[in-house]
């Protein structure tokens, strides 16, 4: 329990590295980076980097800019793994702290790559499919498919499937929040 403040602070440091990855590649490919900073997201501090300037980069470069944050986290995970093993072999209590930090880091990576959250995974999918406003268009596609007459239904399957997954995901998430899971 006494390690939690250290884990909390160090997880912010890893998040800074994540955002630094976006900044470095955006600056490399575009020469400019938008605003960076800290904001409150669900009453929790969250770092952000405005990479809208990357819209003018080539598609492959945009994908690399989006993946740069997770790449930095994966590099941190490798370093944390080596340090964890070294600390455990030395019999240090720091091994537990490093293990907890690495687990949190992997949870952040998973959450970041989940395309149903509007984080890096969402933007990867949006750029890969070359569809701007993916959330809105996918939900609109589901509503259009549901409301259209049978003979008028011509749907974009990708948008429809993503929209159904998105709606289902948020129904489950909000239900879990409401009932307190």
Annotate the PLM regions.
Residues 149-181:
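Hard-cation-handling environments
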């Amino acid at each position: 329990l006494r390690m939690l403040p250290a884990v909390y602070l160090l997880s912010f440091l890893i998040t800074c590295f994540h955002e630094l990855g976006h900044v470095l590649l955006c600056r490399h490919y575009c020469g400019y980076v938008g605003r960076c900073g800290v904001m409150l997201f669900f009453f929790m501090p969250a770092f952000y980097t405005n990479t809208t300037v990357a819209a003018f980069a080539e598609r492959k470069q945009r994908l690399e800019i989006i993946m740069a944050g997770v790449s930095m986290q994966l590099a941190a995970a490798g370093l944390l793994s080596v340090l964890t093993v070294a600390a455990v072999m030395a019999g240090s209590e720091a091994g537990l702290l490093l293990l907890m930090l690495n687990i949190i880091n992997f949870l952040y990576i998973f959450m970041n790559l989940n395309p149903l959250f509007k984080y890096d995974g969402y933007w990867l999918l949006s750029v890969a499919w070359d569809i701007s406003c993916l959330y809105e268009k996918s939900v609109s596609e589901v509503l259009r498919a549901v409301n259209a007459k049978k003979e008028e239904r011509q749907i974009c399957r990708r948008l429809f499937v993503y929209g159904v997954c998105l709606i289902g995901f948020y129904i489950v998430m909000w239900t879990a929040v409401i009932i307190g899971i």
